[in-house]
Amino acid sequence: MATFTPLNAASEDLDKEKRTLEIRIEEAVQIYQNALSAQKQGDDNAATKYYDELLNVRILRELPFTVNSNYKKNNALLLLHYLTRKNHGLFLLSKLQSLLSLDPSTDPIPVYRDALLDFAIALACDYNDIELWSFVAELAEKLEMPRIQRFALESSFYTGYEPFDAERVFTNIDDLNPGKLISLQNLYNLLKKLGGIAEPLPQLDLSISSLYTLPSFFPQLPTPSFHRRSINLCPKIKKLQLSHDTLHGFLDLVLYALQINEKKTPTRGFPSTLIIHVHSLNLSTAESHDLESTDSELWSEISDAGPDTNTINTAAKLSEPVYAKDIVPPPSDNLPKPQLLKRPIDDSDVRISKRSRGRDLRTPSESNLFSLIASITSDINEQIQKRFPDATSPFSGESMFREYSSIFEDYHQLLVNFPSEGSIPDLDVSTDSAANGAFSKMILIDLAMHSANRLEHMQVPDGYLLQLLSEVNSLNMVPAELATFFVESMLRPRKLEPPFYLQQCWGKIFKKKFTTICERIESTLHELVKASLQTPEVFNISQSLFELFLDDYFLALKFSSNDQKDDNVSEIPTESLEYKKLRCLRWKSLTEQVVELQPSCKSSSQRHLIIRNSWARNLLLRLTGCSSEAIVENFKQLRCLLQENSDSLELLNSQCMADLSVQVVDFELSKLQTVEFFNTLFMNTKNLDFNAVIKNLEPVLSPENKFAEDPQAKFISQFLEKTSTEFQIHLWYLLYQAYSSAHRPYNSLLCAFQSLKIILIRLCSSSFSIQDAGRRQAELLGMLNFSSNLFRIIWQKLHEQPDILSPCNEMTVIDCIRIILIYLRTFAIYVGIDEDISDQRIPKPSNPEFDSYAQTVKDSLMSGWCIFYTLFAHLLHYDFIKADAQKLLPQILTAIHSQYSFRGYCSSSNQSFLELSQTECQRLDAWENENEILQCVCCRFNLIIGSEYYVPQSHQSDSVNLTSNDAIKIIPFILGFAVKRSHGWVMPRSDQKNALEIICKVIRFPGENNADVYFNKCAIKEFLERDISPQLTKMLLKSNDILGLREIGSKVVDDRVRGLYYAQSQVLFGYYRSRLKGSRCINDLLVIIKYFLLDLYLNPRRQDSWYTCSSVFSSLADEELGWSAEQICLADDVINEYRRKAILCNLMALSLPFTQDKLFKANVYFDFAMNLYASARPPLEMAAFLPSETRVFSGASGLYNLSMKPIEVSKVIALAADYFGMSAELSNDWRALYMLGKACRKCGDMENALVHFEAAAALAPTKSGSGSQQALLIEPHYALLSNLSKAAIEGSVEIVQILSYLRRIRHPPKDSGSLLEVKNEDVNIYKRNALLFILKALAEMRILDKQSWHHRPTYRIAKIMEHLGNVQQAKEEMETLFSYKTSGKSLLNIWRTPNERPGRHFYYGATYSRYLLSLFYKTNDKVNFLQFLKRFRRSSSTIYEHRQIWLDIMIKYLEDLRLQHSVKETQINDLPLVEFKYVYKEISLLDEQKLSLLHQVYEIRKLNNGLYPTIKVDDFLIDCFMSLYNEVKSSISPLDANIPNSPSTITAKPLNDEKAINNENSVKQKTVITRKDVVSKVLALFRPHRETYYRETQNKILQKLASTSSSLVRSFTEDSSQAGESPGIHEEIQ
């Protein structure tokens, strides 16, 4: 056997993989050949063995046609599968034949199934093997699998891609070859056995047929006997359950059964073997059959595609009943009820209960809105009655609605008992029925009749459904028989009762489904009627079916002529209009045959049937276009027939022939005389000749026209008075469209109002009131639907054209208001019903269409109130009305809004009322109507913006996204009340901030493409990138326009948008100052900067924007400075950039002319001076003034760059002092005087500084802050005392003057007046007394500071004590500012004071630390010094320039150790390893006193932790170790230690011998020790395991370590004394 490479070999070559598959196929073929040889030789055992081995081969275990197959494209593999499976199946059958000859009791079924499986796999590989299909058919016949047998026989006719065509096979038998005739005979026998062939096959020549009769392939194989009945005697019984026990449920079940039958029945229309049994949970049948569905293999259950939209889902298990319902399953009592939103408390009282800033309180809302409006308009009502005494005023209250109480009662009952789904026959006709303005002949035929709308009424006698179910189950009907039985039961008379068709009123859905069933079994019904023409009941059935089909054809014609679609057309299979027409003609001829066979002596029921038939035939003639003469003749005959017996019929379920009476016939005859007029109208509308349409309709519709001269118009007008209301509305709508297209809006508006008036006249007519309740309520529902559409049309006109009412007179407006109020009063009934439903006092209607209808009513309510307001506002313009519109109109709007402030009523009708109310309130008086505007904005856009008097409430309205146009409209209002500015400070409200953020996002920047805006943008950006130079500062302070910024006019930017970005930035900045300050919200401040820059691009000369922008940049710098000391060092460039831009914005604000008051000017001066002073002082002193520009100069050696000269700090502080002084002159504020004194002190002018400090202390309040944040204000008082102590120590001011200042301080110490007495003593005594007085005053001030916030007095007390020689007390005072002795992590024990500049806190920490170190030296406090260092090392976040201070400590510390112990610098020169080991061992045995120096360096190395360069510490550590090393080595005898004399035993080699050099280096590395090894060995001496050895001597080591600190402290002191009292250590830093 050939060898092969497996697939998991190392190589990944595709050719090798392909070769591997070929080898496997070759091996399998070899096994297949061996199996065939064994089978040929008759060795069944060997063949079985080979076949088992073959089928277990890897490539044959996976079927080649599966999705996951890797070899499905290999033809050789497919052939191998095909041959193996086919021959294996034949081998199994052959082996079974041998076994049966030996043992006849062998069960053949398993072998048949295995062989059938093999044949199936073989056919999947090659489906063109006709012989193999015949094998499958014969095996399926033996197994009694008719479905498989039939499929195999049909497949033997057409293989490959040709589908089986039964019609072609059974009609073209002569074209079949002999091999297919046997299959045809077998298929015929099978279908005949199943009852699926209605007609026999065409006659064949039996002799020829016998020649082609082939014998059986397996004649000796037996057919097993199954223990079940024959298949043709065992149909499948389907048990279905009613969804609910009504005719609706039975109808759904019948329709569902037909759909199941259509899916299960083959395409040739073979009879169904599916028997339907109906079951109901609530109805107990007399003969209850607990039948199980048999497993039939002929038909499948349900198609895998699932049921369509008209079917229901069947249950998977037979034990579960099947609901035959195409809408929803039956409701369960345990289902949770939907939670409805209840109406909240009316918020009108809330709105009017707020303080109204002196405004009149609005009238509170009442329960009855119409009574409230009547009370508001009582004066207007009197004026109308006085002007028009005979007219009915629309504002007379409830008295106007009394005559319409019956309408209100009918509508209330209709809503309480809302019709179920589809229970109204037809409400599809609306004002939109004139599609494209065309007048259709179907509109004339349909709408000229009175409305046939009725509510569904389908009650059945008790026990009828139970009897119906029992009869159905006893007859064992198939779906078609069940459908026929149900149709007959609905159309056949019941003993002495008329049929349900005439007795019940069917809803639209029921009628459509019933018509669908009739269409599906029409041929059966036709044959049934045709077979029993003389039966009395057949006339009822045939005539009713004729009327149903005629009604269906009529509705189809109507919808096709109007280009409309019915809502439920998609649920029923549609047919062409021509087929519907032919069907009606077919049933017309059939009913004529029935009429001819009726007896001459006719009963009343037969006479009524003949009348119905005559009317239907006449209507069909009209629909098919018959001549008018024949139609008139038929109507005359029908009139005589009706007059003979005074008959009058009413067909409850017919749309096209609802009422049959003499009056209707007369009306139809008169209608035929108007055909010419309406044909002309039809052609004009079709040609879109609107002027001609107006000319046609104006004379017959307008009531003010005279008809004496035009008899045709008079006749048409009289005819229209007899027509239905729907038809009249249709004509008015045509006239409305014509007026609109002819650009006559006022006339079109009057047409819409006239339609509303016509509907109202119809609802108040006697003919409407005498109808039965069901028909009256159905028509009322349709009329109100008309009015809803008209409301939408009218409001659209009024909204789009505000001046459309200008030509309208007073009476027309009053009449329109009255009509609108009546409709609103009708629709308001729904509000009460909705209240009851939400409060669960009444149940919600089960009709799913109720929600959509409810939304329609809500839309009608709000659009109707918009129409009423518009008409009422126009009425106030007339001269005879004397009323204050600005006060009256907002009351109307507020009353309406408060009445509908629940469950989203106010947002209905596409938020038309909210938009109207908001717009009108802004137009009338935005300030007075602020609350209503806020509520409208909240309901429309979900923007909750509260004022100081009112916060809007949620009305559960559906909000919309805010658009740019909407935002622009509300910008002036929001900016008018929300932005209350006071020199940069804005009332911070989060809701206003969020609202303005949304508005700014919606409105795009208006000047993106304008050249002037772009110029301003570039100029401002370039200006903010400049350095601060003396020239620039001088030019800006002289108010020179150096930027040349351009003004942006109103043509480029809308004035309403111009202040938006300014207002938003002010609100955001105010929000930051009140809530976010100190939280390092950099991103929020950058957003504020963005809005300020956008405002400056549009308004470059707005001084307040430049000034506040400077404050924002300063806040950015403050946030970075106040976070941590480390952040100051990391973000120094960013902080300097913020400070530089803040100063530039200040300069730009100063360059613009001041237009505001002195206080604003003083604030600008003060902030500018503060920015200068803060930038010139630590931390980051003068960094903002460093120039980044360079100049290029030409020298002897070429061009070179020279940096610009920086500004001197003295000039910056002097400029700040000038502006502090100007701010103090304008505002007389203590802060300006306080900062002026500090600036003068830094400039060296102590005398003026003391003057300003004293003035600031006199003006300063006792406490700062407000509320619980109040704290004692001591800054100006401390500054005065501190500078007096400095002046006394320095001698810059005479002592007498100092004493004079001290006598005038606000908080003098107790019992210290003697210290200030002048007794001609020594000046030094006066100086000492002054310092003692200041000490006591500072101590008294510190006692007043109960919160211990202020730390500066403690520092100043320590400085004075040191000067007086009491260093120990000075140190104790300073130690209170630190917490290094406790176990906490923080070093500083000071707090940020309210008036402390950001960043100064960390600078004070550095100053205090340096000063405390010097005091430790002076007091020789070594232990506290070491503890302080340990805590100081971990305090980098609170100490400014922490690293630099630590470096200074380490440098002095190591130098002091080197000098104290005389440690020399040494170099390690290849110490021998043997020698080092011996000496190191001796060193490790030394006592702690000799190792104390190394231990001190080890401790400081651990404490340093890399902050100071570790290599320098290690160098000093090595120096200390080598000093000890040499000392120990010198005390050891070389002979005792066996130490070699030479440091290395490696002999020298020539330089050119590279191998020798490498050997020497390797040996050297093994015999010498390096510097790194020395450090590691020294550190090993003091590892944690040796800590127990030194625990007893720890105090001694600490003392030695502290003794070395004296040089360090001394160095600090010496540096300070040499440089004078430097500001970095000894001077107070403000």
Curated annotation (Swiss-Prot):
According to its UniProt entry, one GO biological process term is: chromosome segregation
Does the record bear Hydrolase in its keywords?
A: no
Q: What keywords sit in the KW lines?
A: Chromosome partition, Nucleus, Repeat, TPR repeat, Transcription, Transcription regulation
Superkingdom assignment: Eukaryota
TPR repeat boundaries on the chain: 8-42, 1230-1263
Alphabetized PROSITE patterns for the sequence: TPR
* Region feature Disordered, mapped onto this chain: 325-347
- Cell compartment(s), UniProt: Nucleus
For this protein, the parts annotated as crossing the membrane are: none
Q: Which residues form a coiled coil?
A: none
Q: Which GO terms describe its cellular component?
A: HIR complex; nucleus
- InterPro entries this protein is in? Hir3/CABIN1, TPR-like_helical_dom_sf, TPR_rpt
This protein's major location comes to: nucleus
Q: How does it assemble?
A: Interacts with hip1 and slm9.
Functional summary from the UniProt entry = Has a role in a nucleosome assembly pathway that is required for the integrity of heterochromatin and proper chromosome segregation. Required for transcriptional silencing in the outer repeat (otr) region of centromeric repeats and the Tf2 long terminal repeat retrotransposons.
Q: Which PANTHER family match?
A: CALCINEURIN-BINDING PROTEIN CABIN 1-RELATED, CALCINEURIN-BINDING PROTEIN CABIN-1
Q: What family does the Swiss-Prot or TrEMBL record give for this protein?
A: Belongs to the HIR3 family.
The protein in question is named: Histone transcription regulator 3 homolog
**Organism (species):** Schizosaccharomyces pombe (strain 972 / ATCC 24843) (Fission yeast)
Q: What gene is this protein a product of?
A: hip3
